[in-house]
Amino acid sequence: MPTHLLCRRSHKPRPTLPLTEGIALDLARVHEACGPARHSFALWLAAAAQGPVLWLSQPQAGRPLNPAQAARPLNPDGIAEYASPSRFLFVQTARAEDLLWAMEEALRGGGAALVVAELAEPPAMTPVRRLHLAAEAGGTFGPAPAGLLLTPGQGGAQGIESRWHLAPAHGLPPPSSSLPGCGAASRECWTLQRLRARTLPPRSWHITRARAGGPLQAAPLPPGAACQQTARPAASRVLPQPQSPLAAPALP
């Protein structure tokens, strides 16, 4: 029986969702974001996407076990700095299984440009594979969607297309004199790490953004610089007070 070693499918470049210069995420795939600023990473992608954004969560996923903070959506005032709140649809589910099912159906339908899922722990391999297939099917008759899993800690979802770690660096000096400063009155700064990707090596960037708004600016970091920044003790960091909190205020 003959064996075909070459694939007959065309190897067209996969469409991507550009975040900033030199940083892009493949569409029709599911990615993972972790780290203390992972919600900001999701909002960056939402700003770059063209179309509705579906945000799925559980009452306590990724949030402290505090009844006052349970089932609280993102603050529209904080979202408005990145994208119009009218583009967002928030859905909460009681179980992680229901959340993954809703994400799969949303990706397959292709109606949302970006589907974000907040999880209390990384999912197993089988659900992630199903999400990839659903995202590919969602681009059959139109632009392909992208999926993003928000997981605590260092992440660890199996089978994802890429894993990203984002941490704030607002009060830290830039690792190089050639990089923009992070003054509290002028710019916000983050350290972005690509921990893994199917076709790209690990890499780190120094991300800055003007507090008055505007595009993200990225500068590559030398190997090991990101680990030194994230490993600094919290007492040495002088973090500015957030001007627009992402969490909505508690109801009286």
Where are each of the predicted segments found?
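Short acidic catalytic loops
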Residues: A106, A112-P122
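C-terminal regions of RecA-like/P-loop NTPase motor modules
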Residues: P202-P252
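Detector for small/aliphatic-rich hydrophobic stretches
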Residues: M1-P59, R72, Y82-A83, S244, ...
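Short beta-alpha junction loops
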Residues: P59-G62, A120, L149-G155
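A glycine-rich, hydrophobic loop/mini-helix early in the fold
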Residues: P36, A42-G109
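Short hydrophobic alpha-helical runs that function as membrane-insertion/retention elements
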Residues: L54, F88-V91, L114-V116, G139-L150
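Acidic, metal-coordinating catalytic cores used for nucleic-acid/nucleotide bond scission
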Residues: R95, A120-T126
